[in-house]
């Protein structure tokens, strides 16, 4: 049985060469090795792109993103594409696990500091602060054991691992996810 991998993107605009080189090319190769789920993270998009113009474009961006992914070689017979907001159970998981992590832990993540720099009025939404916890809900919700990320998102996976450890110790047994950093698998918890 193949390990389960979660990958995806926010439908903030058109995919470009940077997406291909930075992630998609690798994901095409990884779909051969892993049971692959590609999440179109529309809820995550709202944490930084909640203006009407982005919401109005989200539907078309979602369609274009999936078409582009298939066009570059992601096989819908090997990769399950899904829209984050279409899975209500993910929100239930998020509501539970947000109580398992200290807010200071997520406020201190480098990715939050970087993403908050792009705020137009120097404010940070609660949704943006909770971004790593929502990502953890996505990972836990489908039982992903591998998550390909760039260096800028390793802290999200570390938050996920902390939440999973708490769940294993205090609540339920689930599989601990690992970071898949492009071609290098980093085993943080051996």
Language model feature labels by segment:
Residues 2-137:
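N-terminal Rossmann-like or analogous alpha/beta NTP/dinucleotide-binding catalytic cores
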Residues 113-190:
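Active-site cores that bind ATP or allylic diphosphates and position pyrophosphate for catalysis
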């Amino acid at each position: 049985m193949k390990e389960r991998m979660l990958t995806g993107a926010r439908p903030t605009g058109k995919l470009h060469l940077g997406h291909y080189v930075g992630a998609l090319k690798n994901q095409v190769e990884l779909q051969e090795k892993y049971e692959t789920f590609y999440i179109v993270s529309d809820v995550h998009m709202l944490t930084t792109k909640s203006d009407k113009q982005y919401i109005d474009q989200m539907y078309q961006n979602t369609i274009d993103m999936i078409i582009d992914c298939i066009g570059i070689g992601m096989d819908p017979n090997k990769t399950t594409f899904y829209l984050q907001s279409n899975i209500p159970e993910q929100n239930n998981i998020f509501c539970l696990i947000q109580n398992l992590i200290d807010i200071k832990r997520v406020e201190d993540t480098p990715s939050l500091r970087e993403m908050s720099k792009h705020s137009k009025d120097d404010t940070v939404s609660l949704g943006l602060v909770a971004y790593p916890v929502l990502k953890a809900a996505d990972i836990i919700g489908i039982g992903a054991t591998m998550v390909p990320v760039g260096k800028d998102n390793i802290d999200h996976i570390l938050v996920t691992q902390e939440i999973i450890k708490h769940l294993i110790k205090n609540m339920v047994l689930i599989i601990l996810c690992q970071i898949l950093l492009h071609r290098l698998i980093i085993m943080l918890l051996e």
